[in-house]
Regions:
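N-terminal amphipathic/basic-hydrophobic helices that include classical n-h-c signal peptides
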Residues: 1-13
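Helix-start/capping segments and mature chain N-termini
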Residues: 11-85, 89-96, 119-318
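Hydrophobic, Leu/Ile/Phe/Ala-enriched alpha-helical segments that form helix-helix packing faces
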Residues: 2, 98-101, 240
Length: 318
């Protein structure tokens, strides 16, 4: 079973809001219900996004909103889910979910899923449902992770092969794989896990992209390993370039991990977090490194609206 302290923390960080947008209208959180016979509940046939809104100086703003909406539609198309709303409708629902719930900072979860219809793998005569929830959610890996970094293990679970699923899409069913890795890591006293793909090369964390730094060279696994084409990943590559560091997509081995000067995770929920040990072995100095910290600080300046280029990435909620 889970370590009690870890379970308490995981349950504590989510605060329910008042309203959820469901199929074109806002309903009370408690009334946002679907049938237990929903196709997605049985077969994992859904897609989702994770988006953050922050309390910026010009007002509550959402980071890379259009990119997230684009990926939601691309993910849905890849999994044969025909979203019954235009992008403008979903974009407005996302903004309204933050505004109507009176949130200044929020995590936002659009979800596209098959409802109840004919049972069986082939979703015949099955409606496509869409929901958007927004709530106050703190640091995914803990409040101290930004300063102290996280301790991870190499997971016994391999990342699903890109020949078996679509790594560029955020498919609901694929996260069973991630959940196995996360549970196993926490049960063994770690904060998270690094997952390998085919060919014994690194793919990503349980739900984050991974970057490695050696001799000031930044490397991240290519998408072909099964890594998600993360929006934060893309942002970090842009930030690294602005700081004078080129990022290359290259295979990373187990040996590379232990010889790294720095490692860090990226993701919308995770943000930019240093990985300070792997399987109990310190990485570099055993603390988040200088390049990791520089990228993290720049990232936080941008997403909080404090950088001159922030306006290129942020959308005001109201």
């Amino acid at each position: 079973s889970f370590n009690d302290k870890k379970v308490y923390y995981l349950l504590l960080i989510m605060e329910k809001s008042k309203l959820i947008w469901l199929n074109g209208e806002f309903v009370n959180w408690e009334d946002a219900k679907v049938s237990v016979m929903s196709h997605t509940l049985h077969y994992g046939t859904g897609v989702f996004e994770g988006i953050r809104a922050r309390d910026c100086k010009n007002g509550t703003s959402i980071f890379r909103l259009n990119d997230h909406v684009d990926r939601l539609y691309n993910s849905a198309s890849a999994y044969n889910l025909d979203i019954p709303y235009d992008k403008d409708v979903i974009t407005q629902a996302i903004k309204d979910s933050v505004h109507l719930n009176e949130l200044t900072s929020a995590y936002i979860r659009p979800l596209v899923f098959f409802g109840e219809g004919e049972m069986g793998l082939l979703p015949n005569n099955v409606p496509v449902n869409v929901s958007v929830a927004a709530w106050s959610w703190g640091a995914y890996l803990g409040d101290e992770a930004g300063n102290n970094g996280v301790k991870v293990c190499i997971s016994k679970w391999k990342r699903i092969s890109p020949e078996s699923f679509i790594p560029t899409a955020k498919g609901v069913g694929g996260y069973m794989n991630s959940t196995l890795a996360k549970i196993d890591a926490v049960n063994n006293g770690y904060d998270d896990a690094i997952m390998f793909g085919d060919g014994d090369v690194v793919a990503e964390g349980s739900g984050q992209n991974l970057f490695l730094i050696k001799n000031s060279k930044i490397t991240t696994p290519p998408i072909e390993t099964g890594a998600l084409g993360g929006i934060t990943r893309r942002t970090v590559i842009e930030i690294a370039s602005s700081l004078g560091y080129e990022t290359v997509e290259e295979n990373i081995t187990k040996e590379d991990l232990f010889n790294a000067d720095e490692l860090f995770f990226t993701g919308t929920a995770t943000e930019v977090i240093g990985v300070v040990s792997v399987d109990g072995e310190d990485i570099g100095t055993g603390s988040p490194g200088s390049i990791t910290n520089a990228i993290r600080n720049n990232y936080l300046e941008i997403v909080n609206g404090n950088d001159p280029i922030s306006e290129n990435y942020l959308t005001l909620v109201k």
